[in-house]
Amino acid sequence: MRAPSTSANLGSGFDVVAVAHDAYFAEAYIKLTSGCGVDIKFRGFNPGSDNTVKRAFQHLFERLGRCWGVEAEVVNNIPIARGLGSSGASAVAALAAFIREAGLRVEPAVVVEAAGLGEVAAAGSPHFDNVAAAALGGAVVIASVKPLELVKFMPKLIFVIGVPDVPPMPEKTKVMRSVLPREVSFRTYVAQLARVSALVAGFAKSDPRLVALGMSDEVVEPARAPYVPAYGRVKRYALEAGALAVSISGAGPSIIALVEEKNSDVVKAAVERAYIEEGLRAEVKVASITEGALAQNI
């Protein structure tokens, strides 16, 4: 079972919007055993004994009112600490694989809730945007947290994603939240409502122009931009090459550009050049909206 990489926020949709794309995938393999508890082996990056996958299973078992014996192997091919939802995708892939192996029928919101609560191990607090997209696929809007209400769209969108090879920022999520403004003006509030409305309407209509309007942001992105390597040059070069919009992927340092298929390669080359001129190594990919891990259980 596999779950895709994701990009949360997309500008104005801070903490309530994420998209699943086929840039990278996390994979999980499950074997049911006797007894109760989860034994997890990680191939590649090992997050340690207190990890998102383990916590996600604990929350799921608690919600289902039963414990299973599980051996899990997780292969996470999503770059770690890059704003691409790597920890959430690994948890979602493992839960989806378990549900299929155990022959269970579990509501998607229950899986998202368990994986989102499991994110405390990686981010220090629950996060549902990335895990919702990894589970459901497409573009997901969190309409409510309590109770958890998710709305999925499946727009045809293409992105160019730049993933810089830089050292992980210590306590990245905490730092990137600490720089956010505590108050905004009423004018900014109204403008931001208009943008997030355009973002959701763009998802619903599969309209890149509306999505691009929604990816503009004057609240979160300006505060975080100084902490994202090459942000200014990458954004400028991408827009000059024909990108429709550019924003930070999650809390960064990856950057995501909305593009048209006809000029995706041109934008990709422009983003690559921007990183080179900044003296940074980076992997740049063209990616499309994709389905999530739970779609494989249908």
UniProtKB/Swiss-Prot annotation:
Main localization of the protein described in the UniProt heading: cytoplasm
One GO-annotated biological process of the protein: threonine biosynthetic process
Reactions it catalyzes: L-homoserine + ATP = O-phospho-L-homoserine + ADP + H(+)
Enzyme nomenclature, EC number: 2.7.1.39
Compartment(s): Cytoplasm
Positions of ATP binding: 79-89
Pathway linked to the protein: Amino-acid biosynthesis; L-threonine biosynthesis; L-threonine from L-aspartate: step 4/5
Keyword Cytoplasm: yes
A molecular-function term among this protein's GO annotations: homoserine kinase activity
InterPro entries linked to this entry: GHMP_kinase_C_dom (IPR013750), GHMP_kinase_C_sf (IPR036554), GHMP_kinase_N_dom (IPR006204), GHMP_knse_ATP-bd_CS (IPR006203), Homoserine_kinase (IPR000870), Ribosomal_Su5_D2-typ_SF (IPR020568), Ribsml_uS5_D2-typ_fold_subgr (IPR014721)
Coiled coil: none
Enzyme class: transferase
UniProt keyword Hydrolase, yes or no: no
GO cellular component: cytoplasm
Record PROSITE patterns: GHMP_KINASES_ATP
Keywords: Amino-acid biosynthesis, ATP-binding, Cytoplasm, Kinase, Nucleotide-binding, Threonine biosynthesis, Transferase
Task performed by this protein: Catalyzes the ATP-dependent phosphorylation of L-homoserine to L-homoserine phosphate.
Similarity comment: Belongs to the GHMP kinase family. Homoserine kinase subfamily.
Protein name, per record: Homoserine kinase
Gene from which the chain derives: thrB
